[in-house]
Regions:
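Conserved beta-sheet core of the metallophosphoesterase superfamily
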Residues: 156-222
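Active-site glycine-centered loops adjacent to acidic/histidine catalytic or metal-binding residues
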Residues: 11, 50-51, 84-85, 146, ...
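Conserved catalytic scaffold of divalent metal-dependent phosphoesterases
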Residues: 67, 87-168, 197-200
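Core catalytic region of metal-dependent phosphoesterases/phosphodiesterases
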Residues: 3-5, 12, 16-116, 169-173
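Accessory, non-catalytic peripheral segments of nucleic-acid enzymes
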Residues: 2, 40, 219-321
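Structural motif
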Residues: 6-8, 47, 126, 142-146, ...
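Beta-strand-turn-beta hairpins that frame and shape the catalytic cleft
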Residues: 1-7, 116-126, 138-142, 190-194, ...
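Histidine-centered catalytic micro-motifs
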Residues: 12-14, 144-148, 174-184
Length: 321
């Protein structure tokens, strides 16, 4: 085994989308891929940056049962975990958290208080959700947290306007790895580097075109190094306008229909019956999910025959100009 290499991932959100079975399946398939990747790299240590579960107030029994099965995939690994805000009962601290149910697993260590811990020759500061800047351990080679840092992106559309300041957290360590924000971000400052690892796979349309995956950290040298490995196995989200729907073919050819969660933006006037048949044609291809968003009006249409195969469909002929 690689003594000095440690994997990092965060924000798994088990039970996302109302404990939907299909999303549990996405999570399980990702975990099988992830653990297989680490075994190939001879890595048996993993740090997790918070938000194992999605719902903080209660956890579905089916989701609990699934989590037990999921964690069996990690039996050969050492897991070092912190609770995130979705794991915490209280909104501002992690004194009561759902990761306590993992205490019976000997390969898992949960840090629910700010703690400096020696791991593979490095001093790591573990900071659960709600850790104040004053309580972040000092003189650490790296700090792991679930921080809300000012001027970083929550996602592709929203920036955090209030939170901890980067210059304050970098006084504690020159390297910060954190969960919480789902957009993967890596910023270098004069005093060090802050990395939001992001969620391991896309979970909604806010994640569009954001690289997902995991990091591998190397603790062997004095300065910690790290590499990012992209997840190419999980479904992605795609927004496409009706007028550019033909672009969907190329995306599907590359990724596969079953790995596409699609939102069609109705940006042109179209006859209702034609839109219904277009949607049926796409559903025939078997996408992971399909929704529509209406920016334009619909009109009553003629009874025009449209084939099931999307490849034979002329979208432009269906649009009312």
């Amino acid at each position: 085994m690689e003594k000095y290499k440690i994997a990092f991932f965060t924000d798994l959100h088990i039970g996302v989308h109302q404990n939907n079975e299909r999303w549990l399946d996405v999570t399980y398939k990702w975990a099988k891929w992830f653990t297989s990747e680490l075994k190939e790299k001879n890595i048996n240590k993993i740090i997790f940056g918070g938000d194992l579960f999605h719902y903080r107030d209660e956890i579905n029994v089916k989701t609990l049962h699934f989590t037990d099965k999921l964690l069996d995939l990690f039996d050969e690994f050492e897991l070092y975990m912190i609770p995130g805000n979705h794991d915490a009962y209280y909104k501002d601290n992690a004194t009561v958290h759902s990761l306590s149910i993992l205490n019976n697993r000997k390969n898992i260590k949960v840090f629910d208080k700010p703690t400096a811990f020696n791991l593979a020759s490095k001093q790591i500061g573990f900071c659960p959700w709600g850790t104040s800047i004053d309580d972040v351990p000092t003189d650490c080679d790296m700090v792991v947290g679930h921080f809300e840092l000012e001027n970083f992106n929550f996602n592709n559309h929203k920036i955090c306007e209030e939170g901890m300041k980067s210059q304050d957290i970098l006084k504690k360590s020159k390297l910060i790895f954190t969960g919480h924000f789902h957009k993967r971000q890596q910023r270098k400052f004069e005093d060090g580097t802050i990395i939001y690892a992001g969620n391991p796979f896309e979970m909604d349309f806010n994640d569009i075109k954001d690289q997902k995956g995991y990091y591998v950290l190397d603790f062997e040298e004095e300065n910690i190094t790290y590499d990012f490995y992209e997840n190419n196995v999980s479904p992605i989200h795609v927004k496409v306008t009706l007028s550019e729907l033909e672009d969907l073919q190329a995306i599907a050819k590359n990724k596969g229909w079953s790995n596409l969660s699609i939102k069609i933006i109705i940006d042109k006037e179209i006859k209702i019956n034609l839109l219904d048949k277009i949607i049926s044609s796409i559903n025939y291809e078997g996408p992971f999910a399909l929704t529509t968003d209406y920016l334009n009006k619909l009109t009553l249409g003629d009874n025009i025959s449209i084939p099931n195969d999307l490849g034979d469909l002329n979208i432009k002929e269906c649009i009312v100009e």
